[in-house]
Regions:
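Glycine- and small/polar-enriched repetitive beta-structure motifs of secreted/surface proteins
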Residues: 1-172
Length: 172
């Protein structure tokens, strides 16, 4: 542990904490927290948090958060968040968010959001959003949105939208 309050309370074996308050409370075995407040509260085994406030509050086992505020609050087992505020709040198990604001708020189990603001607000279980603002708001379970603003707002469950602005608003 290196830095003020880094690895302060209950740091597991072979855990690494570098930065002010990094991994400061309940950092599990083999986990890594680098950056101010990275992995600060309850970091699971083999979890990785790199960046200011990355994986800050409740990061699950094998979860990865890289970037400013990535995986900030409640990142579940095996979830991956890469980019500014990617997977920021409530990222489900095995969910993946890559890109600026991708999967920012409530990403379901096994969902994938890749691209600027893709799957940003409420992405359902096993949903896929690829492209800038694809599946941006309220993407249903098992849905697919590929392309710029594809299924941007309110895509229903088990729906598919492929192409620029395909199924842009309220796809059933």
């Amino acid at each position: 542990a290196l830095g003020y309050a880094a690895g302060q309370t209950s740091q597991g074996n072979n855990a690494v904490a570098i930065g002010r308050s990094a991994g400061s409370q309940s950092q599990s075995t083999l986990s890594v927290a680098i950056g101010m407040q990275a992995g600060q509260l309850t970091q699971g085994q083999t979890a990785v948090a790199v960046g200011y406030r990355a994986g800050e509050d409740t990061q699950g086992e094998n979860a990865t958060a890289v970037g400013f505020g990535a995986g900030l609050t409640t990142q579940a087992l095996g979830a991956t968040a890469l980019g500014y505020k990617a997977g920021q709040t409530s990222q489900g198990q095995q969910a993946t968010a890559v890109g600026y604001l991708a999967g920012t708020n409530t990403q379901g189990l096994g969902s994938t959001a890749i691209g600027f603001s893709s799957g940003q607000v409420t992405q359902g279980t096993n949903a896929v959003a690829l492209g800038r603002e694809a599946g941006h708001t309220s993407q249903g379970n098992n849905s697919v949105a590929i392309g710029y603003q594809a299924a941007e707002d309110n895509q229903g469950g088990s729906s598919v939208a492929i192409g620029i602005r395909a199924g842009e608003t309220s796809q059933g």
